[in-house]
Amino acid sequence: DAVEIRCPACGTEGVQRIAEIGDVWLDAGIVPFSTLGWQNPTWIEGGYGNGAAKELTGADLPDHDYWQTWFPAHWVSEMREQIRLWFYSQLFMSVCLVDKAPFRSVLGYEKMLDEHGRPMHGSWGNLIPAEEAFSRMGADVMRWQYCDQPPDRDLLFGYGPAHEIKRKLLTLWNSVGFLVRYANIEGFRPTFDDLAAGPTGVELRPLDRWLVARTEKVVADATAALEDQLTHRLIAAFESFVDDLSNWYIRRSRRRFYDYDDAAFRTLWFALATGLRVISPVMPFLADHLWRNLVADRCEGAPESIFLAGWPELRRPDERLLAEIAEVRRIVELGREARSTAGVKLRQPLRRVYVRGSRLAHHHAQEIAEELRVDEVGFDQGPVAQIRLLPNLRVLGPRLGRKVPEIKAALERGEAEELGEGRVRVAGEELAADEVIRGERVEIAGWTIAYDGTLSVALDTEIDSDLALRGRVYELIHTVNTMRKDAGLELTDRIVLTLPDGGDLLGHRDWIKAETLATRIEVGDALAISKA
């Protein structure tokens, strides 16, 4: 308002901006026209008002052709309050001037509060200056907090949520580090063309094909989320993808990396590099750093920056395979739940597990056996989850009336047939999930059963002497590998292992040596390792 200009029409000096405006945001509604050169015949360098503001601002006043290029805006965003202020004033002025909206899409969002839901005030001591946040949590973590927030809810901003985000990002960091570490050992150097084509020239296992499909799925989900301008959906899709990649693919493929399985290297590299491209709009600095380690410094002809690589190509994922592994993972989760309920460690082998209600997992029995550390996996056999069922009289009474006592008696006798999704068939009637009340579980001796309404997983928890011995071997292997890590040994270093009175453990000598990279096993006074 302190800037004075000369009127180009009459030559009057000292012309000032009109001070009486209703609201700065209402006044700002003219921005799509005033800053883009609407109806301006020529481009004016150095300022607005036919050059009258020259040397007061470095901005140019574009010409009308420039306005036509950029009008209407693809996207504008501000707080919800701008619906009645800036968004409205832009729309009103634009319709009056050119009979057209000045934007193609609008995103409004709610307030930012502290992590406890209170407004931020300097006098309250809960205000976080931007410079402090940049220093303590980093720009990418700040961006993640903003983008992870559904726009119709208040953002609770603070160092607590930032710490949780860093914990999640550590999984991604460790996954990239895992591949880079083994790639450096084995000299793995893919070509940049492999990123567009996917893992080619190798025979992919079903697990590899699943990760390719999972990668294609996260690209599709992220693309849809960005097109809908809902970045919290992108982050949810990416977090689920990283969990699957780390806690399923890498964990189930570790030995393949020890043995330099080219298909595993190519598949994981493709998935990680593609995933970084997906998340780069949210966390540009970390994504670019990891890209350089994973791609730019490793692939001839690769763009130096992830932002020169473009968006991943959209492909149709194998939905059937994705559904199969999703069900397998759910079975494994239920099996681990049953182990936890029974108080049996995962390193303790068990004899068998029986699964009921599975539609897609029958071809993945070996994976289930390995994940749950059992010798046998059976489907649609074994004990059934015995859960006491009662009729929901409030819902069932009006529908079946006099037949309710018969249904109640049949439920008490355990004659209900599970139909999935909480539905049951009993006494000739099919009951919906809300027509049945599920009571306490009835225990079965020697078995622990976990049930989620569709799938039932029954775990045989009896441990004989053979299972107990194998459990001790697993515990020993875990302890020795922890000792290797604590001693700072490299992944490829060989050791000499000393066992105190090896006894029956030596019957599994070859297994122990293979899992601990031991060249030989000696018997001594205490458990010890030394570099071979």
Residue locations for each model-derived region?
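Short, solvent-exposed helix-loop connector elements
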Residues: R153-P161
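Conserved, well-structured core segments
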Residues: L85-S89, E239
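Aromatic-residue-lined binding/catalytic grooves and analogous aromatic/hydrophobic interfacial grooves
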Residues: W43, A59
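Short, solvent-exposed cationic patches
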Residues: S135-C147
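A short glycine/serine-rich beta->alpha loop
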Residues: D65-Q82
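Short Ser/Thr-interspersed hydrophobic loop/turn segments at strand-loop and sheet-helix junctions
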Residues: S89-C96, Y146
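Feature 926 captures the class I aminoacyl-tRNA synthetase adenylation module centered on the KMSKS loop
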Residues: D1-P32, W38-N40, L97-R136, G160-A532
